[in-house]
Amino acid sequence: MNMMDANEIIAFIQKSEKKTPVKVYVKGNLEGIDFGASSKAFITGPTGVVFGEWKEIEPVLAANADKIEDYVVESDRRNSAIPLLDTKGIQARIEPGAIIRDQVTIGNNAVIMMGASINIGAVIGEGTMIDMNVVVGGRGTIGKNCHIGAGSVIAGVIEPPSAQPVVVEDDVVIGANAVILEGVRVGKGAVVAAGAVVIEDVPPYVVVAGTPARVIKQIDEKTRSKTEIKQELRQL
C-alpha cells in the first residue's frame, strides 16, 4: 500500500483548477447559441441540457436573455479542488451514495457501502469492507481483508503535514461507530469494539474496547467466530 505524502496532496490541491460544474436545463430560441468551448450542449428544438463550468455558461445566459425563456441550474459544488474518483475501472463493489475523492486507492474485491466518505490519499486494501457512513480521512490507510463497521471514523491528516494518519493493518475488524484518532496504528488481526475511541496504538491480535480504548483480552476462537470475514460478500 502506497501512502501519499501530505505535501504532495497539498500541492495537488493548490495547483488544481477550481471547478464549479453545472447542469443547465434551458428553454427558448436556442439556435446558434454557443455555450462555450468546454461545455457540452444537447439541444433539441427549443429545449436542451448544457453541461459545463458556471463561469463559462453564466455570461452566455445573461448575453442571450432575450432568446432564453427559462432555465434551471443544478449545482452540487463550488470552486471544488478535488474531483471524485473515476471508479469505472476499479475491480471492487462500490454502492450508490459513496463519496470517494480522487487519488484514493481501492484494492480488488473491496466493498464500499452507501454513504461512506473516503478522502484524498486514502488507501483501501484488497477484500476490505467499508460499511455504511464510514469516514476515512485523508491518507487514512486500511489493510487487506478488514471490516470497518458502520459509522466509524478513521481519522486522516493532511495538515499539519508532519502529522501521521491512521494505519489499520490486515485482518482487522472495527465495530460500528468506533473512532480511531490521528496517528494510531491498529495491529494485524485486532478487533476494536463498537463505540470505542482509540487514542493509542493497538497491538496485533487483541480486542480493545471503551473510551479511551483499552486491551480487554487476546483474540480467541470465540472472538474469531464472531468477527469472521465472509469472502462471499466480496466476490464480484
UniProtKB/Swiss-Prot annotation:
Organism: Brevibacillus brevis (strain 47 / JCM 6285 / NBRC 100599)
Protein function: Catalyzes the transfer of an acetyl group from acetyl-CoA to tetrahydrodipicolinate.
Name recorded for this polypeptide: 2,3,4,5-tetrahydropyridine-2,6-dicarboxylate N-acetyltransferase
Known pathway: Amino-acid biosynthesis; L-lysine biosynthesis via DAP pathway; LL-2,6-diaminopimelate from (S)-tetrahydrodipicolinate (acetylase route): step 1/3
Catalytic activity annotation: (S)-2,3,4,5-tetrahydrodipicolinate + acetyl-CoA + H2O = L-2-acetamido-6-oxoheptanedioate + CoA
EC number: 2.3.1.89
GO molecular function, one term: tetrahydrodipicolinate N-acetyltransferase activity
Family in the record: Belongs to the transferase hexapeptide repeat family. DapH subfamily.
BP-aspect Gene Ontology terms: diaminopimelate biosynthetic process; lysine biosynthetic process via diaminopimelate
Keyword Transferase applies: yes
